[in-house]
Amino acid sequence: MFPRPLTPLAAPKSAETLGRTPRRAPLGRARAGLGGPPLLLPSMLMFAVIVASSGLLLMIERGILSEMKPLPLHPPSHKGAAWSGTDPKPRGLSLDAGDSDLQVREDIRNRTLRAVCGQPGMPRDPWDLPVGQRRTLLRHILVSDRYRFLYCYVPKVACSNWKRVLKVLAGILNNVDVRLKMDHRSDLVFLADLRPEEIRYRLQHYFKFLFVRDPLERLLSAYRNKFGEIREYQQRYGAEIVRRYRAGAGPSPAGDDVTFPEFLRYLVDEDPEHMNEHWMPVYHLCQPCAVHYDFVGSYERLEADANQVLEWVRAPPHVRFPARQAWYRPASPESLHYHLCNVPRALLQDVLPKYILDFSLFAYPLPNVTKEACHQ
C-alpha cells in the first residue's frame, strides 16, 4: 500500500484580496511587478503560526519535543504495489503498535495541511498561484514520463542525487556515480517545459513526491556550502551581506567570511518568495497546497525513503539511490544546535516566521535554545 496522500480539504474560494507588506529587494536584481492573483501567503502567516502552535502543543503533550533528532514523517517502509498510471491513488498505511509518536506527527502534518490549505483564498492548483509563484513551482518539478512521476526538488535535500537517478532512469547516465560532475539543467524535463494541458494531465495522473529537511538544518547546510566553498556566492551575496550587516566593513569586502548570524539577518530582510532557491522555504518552492503530493520523504530517512519511492514507481532493480559518501559531513542536529546557541535569541525569533510553514506542515519541532539546553 501507499502512504496516505497529502490532500487538502476543499473550501470555497474567497473574493477578498489580502494586502502585502513591502520587502527589501533581493540582492543582485531589481524587484519586478508580478501579474496574476494577489499574493496571499504573507497575510496567512499569523494563522499558520497559530496552527503550528496548536500542533506543537500536541507534540509536547506526547513528549515528542524532548528529543532533538526529528522522527520520520511517515511510517517505515512497507512492501506494496508499485505505481503505474492506471493504479488507484495512494491510500493510508497501517502502523505497527510501536509507531504512536510517528502517527502523531503524520496526523499533525495532515491536519495542518488541511487547516492551512483549506482556508479561503489559498491555492487549490498551480493556476491559482500568482505568475511568479507558479513559475517558481513549475521550474522545480521534474518529470519522468517513462515512470510516470513528478519530483519537486528542494536544494540541500539531496536533489543532486535525485537528478542523477532521473538521468539514469531516462537512459542518459549509466549509473548514479556521485563522483561525476552534475549538470542540474541539461537532459532533465521540468513541468515548466510543458504546455498547460500537459502539465494538468501529469499533475492529475502521475505519482508526486518531494523530500524535506529540518528548515534550520537546511539553512545551515546552505550557509556552509555556498559561503564557505563557492566563490560565486561569496561575491554575489556574501560581499553585500557584509556591507549591510557588519559595522566598519570596507567598501569592497571579499564576502568569504560571512558569519551565520549575518546570514540570518540577511534572511530576515528578504522576501521569501524571491529568495535564492537554496534558502527559499520549501512551501514556496513546492507549493503543497497547490500540488497534492502523494508522498513526503524525509532527509532523516533519505536512503530508505528514496528506495521506497523507486520501488513504487517500478524502477529497474539495479537503480538504487546513491548511498552517502563516507567523506561527506552534512550539517547535523548537533552542529545546528551549536550554531543556534550562538545566535541572538531576538534574531532567531525574527527568522522563524519566514519558515514557520515548513516547520508546521512537515512536523519539524522548533529549536530548543533555552539556556539549559545550550549548556548541556
UniProtKB/Swiss-Prot annotation:
Superkingdom classification of source: Eukaryota
The UniProt record lists the keyword Transit peptide: no
Any Pfam family hit: Sulfotransfer_2
UniProt-listed Enzyme Commission number(s): 2.8.2.35
Enzyme class, broadest EC rank: transferase
Ranges annotated as biased composition (Low complexity): 18-30
Location of region: Disordered: 1-30, 76-96
Keywords, in A-Z order: Carbohydrate metabolism, Glycoprotein, Golgi apparatus, Membrane, Signal-anchor, Transferase, Transmembrane, Transmembrane helix
Entry annotated with the keyword Transferase: yes
Lumenal topological segments: 61-376
Membrane topology: Single-pass type II membrane protein
Gene Ontology MF terms in the entry: dermatan 4-sulfotransferase activity
GO cellular component, one term: Golgi membrane
Catalytic activity: dermatan + n 3'-phosphoadenylyl sulfate = dermatan 4'-sulfate + n adenosine 3',5'-bisphosphate + n H(+)
Binding site for 3'-phosphoadenylyl sulfate: 155-161, 213-221
Biological processes annotated in GO: carbohydrate biosynthetic process; dermatan sulfate proteoglycan biosynthetic process; dermatan sulfate proteoglycan metabolic process
Cytoplasmic side: 1-39
Compartmental location: Golgi apparatus membrane
Glycosylation sites: 110, 368
Similarity field: Belongs to the sulfotransferase 2 family.
Functional description taken from the UniProt entry: Catalyzes the transfer of sulfate to position 4 of the N-acetylgalactosamine (GalNAc) residue of dermatan sulfate. Plays a pivotal role in the formation of 4-0-sulfated IdoA blocks in dermatan sulfate. Transfers sulfate more efficiently to GalNAc residues in -IdoUA-GalNAc-IdoUA- than in -GlcUA-GalNAc-GlcUA-sequences. Has preference for partially desulfated dermatan sulfate.
Protein name, entry field: Carbohydrate sulfotransferase 14
Organismal lineage: Eukaryota, Metazoa, Chordata, Craniata, Vertebrata
